[in-house]
């Protein structure tokens, strides 16, 4: 092989190595972003569950107050 062909081959190999290195760095960045987004999703799910529990509790309280109010209104009508 001539020196010129060898240099071209070496340049192509170096370019391939550089491309692979950049892609590996991009993969690592995407993995980190994916992990971050996964944590955000888990946090949002946890918050949603808490809000659903609180909503159910408040609905139960509202129902209790409505029953009491109906009972009081019933007593007032009796008087």
Swiss-Prot record:
InterPro entries: Cell_div_ZapB. The keyword Cell division applies. Its main location: cytoplasm. GO terms for biological process: division septum assembly; FtsZ-dependent cytokinesis. It holds the Pfam family ZapB. One of its GO terms (cellular component) is cytoplasm. It comes from the Bacteria. Residues 3-79 form a coiled coil. It is found in: Cytoplasm. Keywords: Cell cycle, Cell division, Coiled coil, Cytoplasm, Septation. Belongs to the ZapB family. Homodimer. The ends of the coiled-coil dimer bind to each other, forming polymers. Interacts with FtsZ. Non-essential, abundant cell division factor that is required for proper Z-ring formation. It is recruited early to the divisome by direct interaction with FtsZ, stimulating Z-ring assembly and thereby promoting cell division earlier in the cell cycle. Its recruitment to the Z-ring requires functional FtsA or ZipA. This is Cell division protein ZapB. It comes from Salmonella typhi. The gene is zapB.
């Amino acid at each position: 092989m001539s020196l010129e062909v060898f240099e071209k081959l070496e340049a192509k190999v170096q370019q391939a190595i550089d491309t692979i290195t950049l892609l590996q760095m991009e993969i690592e960045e995407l993995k980190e972003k994916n992990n971050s987004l996964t944590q955000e999703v888990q946090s949002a799910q946890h918050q949603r569950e808490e809000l659903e529990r609180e909503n159910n509790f408040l609905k139960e309280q509202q129902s209790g107050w409505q029953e009491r109010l109906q009972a009081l209104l019933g007593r007032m009508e009796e008087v």
